[in-house]
Regions:
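Bacterial N-terminal signal peptides that target proteins for export
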Residues: 1-8
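Cleavable N-terminal signal peptides
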Residues: 8-9, 19
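Sec/Tat signal peptide C-region and signal peptidase I cleavage site
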Residues: 15-21
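Transmembrane beta-barrel domains of Gram-negative outer membranes and organellar outer membranes
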Residues: 21-283
Length: 283
């Protein structure tokens, strides 16, 4: 097993889960940057029904075990992110025409999820009518393989502008950008879809929020392996003893999204290191 996978598993087991500034179960990113030395870790499980894979022709109920991410504030204007899935398990219910035959003997297949590395840079803070704005760049590494029927074997790149605005006690999040997706079936061809997300976080109690979003990507139609995707997520966030838990329902809006699903998880934030003061030279 590659070394990074053992590291990700160790993170998921050792790091406790949940904090107020992270926006799980939403996938629309927050424009706010963690303060220097702050670390935020989250961990969750997803149960998704009727998930389709165009390259392998597989369809079934997908269980995602260990949907995890680590965010680290590395400076006043920068944040580093790493995320992945410890194990994707698909209970196969249907098999359609395939482009790459999956190598499985039964009705279940599994694989590690793709690893995503990202950097978020703060451009401006929220002030008056102006929202907070950040820029994010991320790369998704192809760890899930064709043999399992769950991967594309393509490195993908993402860039987006992130926005955040408070309205009374509520928060509005939005992002817009584009992706560069290599074609798994046509050598040298790529798709550059628009990526988007808009979300709301509405407090209804001191320790309870309602959350909702629509998020996805849209590009040229009929691109095998690079299909358009869009999801709606609605749910709650709640706190117990400094740990924030989340629960949400998922509804897919395209043919290659899950028909429905449930996600649960938690997030924890802590101070990992202090910013060293700059030395002062007296002449």
């Amino acid at each position: 097993m590659p070394k990074w996978r053992w590291i990700l598993i160790a993170i998921c087991v050792v790091v406790p889960a949940a904090a107020r500034a992270q926006q799980r179960p939403l996938r629309t990113d927050d424009a706010e940057i963690l303060k220097t030395g702050r670390v935020r870790a989250d961990f969750g499980i997803e149960f998704l029904q009727k998930q389709r894979y165009s390259l392998s022709g597989l369809q079934g109920d997908l269980t995602r075990l260990g949907v995890a991410s680590i965010h680290v504030g590395v400076g006043e204007y920068a944040e580093f992110q790493i995320s992945g899935v410890v194990q994707d398990v698909l209970a196969v219910s249907e098999r359609d025409e395939w482009y790459f035959p999956p190598k499985l003997s039964g009705n279940t297949t599994s694989d590690f999820g793709d690893l995503v590395l990202g950097t978020k840079l703060k451009l401006v803070g929220e002030q008056g009518c102006r929202p907070a704005i950040s820029f994010k760049f991320a790369v998704e590494l192809p760890n899930a393989k064709h043999d399992s029927g769950l991967g594309t074997d393509q490195t993908e790149f993402y860039s987006s502008l992130l926005f955040k605005k408070h309205w009374r006690r509520s928060q509005i999040l939005a992002d817009v950008g584009f992706a560069i997706l290599g074609s798994p079936v046509s050598l040298g061809r790529q798709t550059d879809p628009l990526t988007y997300g808009i979300a709301a976080i509405i407090p209804i109690h001191r320790s309870l929020n309602l959350v909702g979003e629509i998020q996805g990507r849209h590009g040229p139609p009929r691109r095998v392996g690079n299909e358009n995707k869009s999801q709606i997520r609605t749910g709650i966030q709640f706190w117990t003893q400094g740990i924030r838990w989340d629960l949400a329902g998922v509804a897919g809006l395209t043919h290659y999204d899950p028909k429905s699903g449930i996600v649960v998880g938690a997030t924890y934030e802590f101070q990992a290191f202090q910013r060293s003061p700059s030395p002062v030279t007296i002449k």
